[in-house]
């Protein structure tokens, strides 16, 4: 559905992305209490929920983003309101419906996760500035991330980023080449982490 609506990506890779999001996203097991003792006494570190999180979704990775964010955010005791990208609204809404149905069947309250039904830049901005929102998580282009970071609220921004690959003398060069090409072409390179190789490689 995401490939059809957005016109981007590769179906087989999107299936794998969803599976990885379901199986590898940290859940409640990640949130443990730690005690640190030293010369100055004992410190107890315990994570606490923010409350309601506004999650701004991208068009490049809409379904896996909803799955990933739902798991880690509700595991932390939060509720989530998703703001779909206009180019991926149908698949984002459908994913939220499916995940909320599963949560409801597991005993979660209605509305633990939801999505904006009216999708627009104004609606997204209204969500981010709502007094009911305690944290913003924005995945998208520089403009969206900038808006989240300048909202005056705690925000996590994930914009485009292309990390370099360092292939040094300890590498299996043939395998490194295969892995670099596979990673850079995965889902037609939509995940904003495509690699490039510096010509000044030490190999």
Regions found by a protein language model. Name each.
Residues 1-43:
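N-terminal Rossmann-like NAD(P)+-binding subdomain of aldehyde/semialdehyde dehydrogenases
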Residues 75, 145-203:
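ALDH superfamily catalytic-core signature
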Residues 118-122, 142-144, 162:
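Short acidic loop-to-helix transition motifs that present clustered carboxylates
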Residues 82, 115-117, 137-140, 155-158, ...:
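General beta-strand structural signal in soluble alpha/beta enzymes
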Residues 31-45, 113-133:
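A structured beta-alpha segment of the ubiquitous adenosine-cofactor-binding alpha/beta core
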Residues 28-101, 106, 142, 151-155, ...:
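Conserved small-residue-rich beta-alpha loop and adjacent elements
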């Amino acid at each position: 559905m995401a490939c059809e609506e957005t016109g981007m990506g590769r179906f087989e890779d999107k299936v794998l992305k969803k599976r990885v999001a379901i199986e590898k996203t940290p859940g409640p097991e990640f949130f443990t209490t730690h005690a640190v003792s030293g010369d100055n006494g004992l410190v107890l570190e315990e994570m606490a929920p923010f409350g309601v999180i506004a999650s701004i979704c991208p068009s490049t990775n809409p379904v896996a983003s909803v799955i990933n964010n739902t798991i880690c955010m509700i595991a932390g005791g939060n509720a989530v309101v998703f703001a779909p990208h206009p180019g991926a609204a149908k698949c984002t809404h459908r994913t939220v419906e499916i995940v909320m149905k599963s949560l409801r069947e597991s005993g979660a309250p209605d509305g633990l996760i939801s999505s904006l039904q009216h999708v627009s830049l104004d609606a997204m901005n209204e969500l981010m500035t709502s007094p009911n929102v305690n944290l913003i998580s924005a995945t998208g282009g520089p403009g969206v991330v900038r808006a989240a970071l300048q909202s005056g609220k705690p925000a996590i921004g994930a914009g485009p980023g292309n990390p370099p690959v360092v292939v040094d003398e300890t590498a299996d060069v043939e395998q490194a080449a295969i892995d670099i090409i596979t990673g850079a072409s995965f889902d037609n390179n939509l995940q904003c982490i495509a690699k490039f190789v510096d010509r000044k490689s030490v190999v």
